[in-house]
Amino acid sequence: MNRLASTLLLLMSTTFVMGANQISFADELTPAPISQTINQDTIPISRIAEEIGRIRTSGSLPAVMLKWPKAERENFLNFYAARSDLPLWFGGEALNERRDELQRRLSSADDDGMNAEDYPAPFISASETDTRKIAEADLILSASAVSFARDARGARIDTIRLSKLITPKLMLPRPTMVLSDLMGADHVGDRLEAYQPRHKAYQQLKARLMELRETTGSLSDAEPVIIKTTGPKARTTTAMVSMTAPSAFDLIANMERWRWVPPELGADHIFVNLPEFNLKLIRHGEVVHTTRTVVGKPDTATPIFSAAINSIIVNPSWHVPESIIRNEFLPKMAEDPTYAEKSGYEVTQIGENIAIRQPPGERNALGLIKFNLPNEHAVYLHDTPMRKLFANVDRAYSHGCVRVENPFSLAAAVLQDPRYSEEGLKAFVGRDERLIKLIEPLPVHLAYFTVITGEDGQLRRLGDIYGYDGLVLTALKIDQRRNYAALK
């Protein structure tokens, strides 16, 4: 089925919602080529504006707007009211050309792993004189454009419903911003495209998805091939699928998660891809430092969020989190009240509240150095006394924090200060905490991507250690058992 035919079929189910009533107008619209225009000699723009005003004040809304928060729906309607309800997409050759471009972009949403059916783009016959239908079509096109822009920035999924550990700070554009943006753009399609992630990795995923859709005609492509690792460290783990060719569903899930990453990562930043068990320090687009990591176990997963390192502590104390006290310390202390003290911890009790601290030292759970990045999860980067774990292929062992294999080398690369070379930092090791503040906070992004580009330039799939691929696809209502025909 071609895209135009698919869009026309979609139009048959497009409705406006007014209270409890649904007003269908799809079967009254006559399909027409995109290039046709409305006869302005017979339809004054003022009449279309009057109809838009009636629809707006009646409380009728395009169905595509129903998932928006109330404030965003009001913002959308206020935009039209502020311009005297003049249509954005009908009325003159110039507007008609912009409408055609918008329709084409919306109908190709599948290329970005989105669903074109979510962004109806109604077509109106050049001979159409019913101003109500034209007004409805104008509002639907505007609402679809806004929904596309918001979804491109991550609005498709309420991440907190997937997991309380997924807390990206989404930058969702308001309807007024999107529509003003499009009105001022020379090329509407390009401007709408700019709301999609611009990161290189996203573009690689998109290119591969388009290739699969063009060559297979389906999103359920061939069965993946698993190449087992070999050697003394090989074992049946999530790393076993690290050479698996990604399916279209893998691509879509990962493209969606790129929408959770800030549009601008920062000229200098740290990027931690949890399934890759790897950390990269990037300065001006170049990787200047990389190191292995140990991340959270599936039942104590490392959160997905962005924050910034503001200081580094040599010889840190570990203030045991309440969850670890409750789940690990209290059961053992119930058997032996002196368990914590015998293990080298300091226990403070005020009423029914217990605080447990581990003093600095080689046995400290944080190791000899810690990177502070304030966040709601109380998660940070740190050293570890259990360095042997870095030799493993699968490195999901922590309580949620990110353990770094070469922390002093990373700290020196972060600080970029002759006073704090790797050896200089190691000279501070002792019993007393040493706090070093960064001149400028360094952004840190803890992300989750199971499809990456290998050293050979080919995409490969990593283990889905937390099962987020399936959660994302379920949230997007994508059934992997279906055969999704590519729209060509």
Model-inferred region functions:
Residues T7-G19:
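Bacterial N-terminal signal peptides
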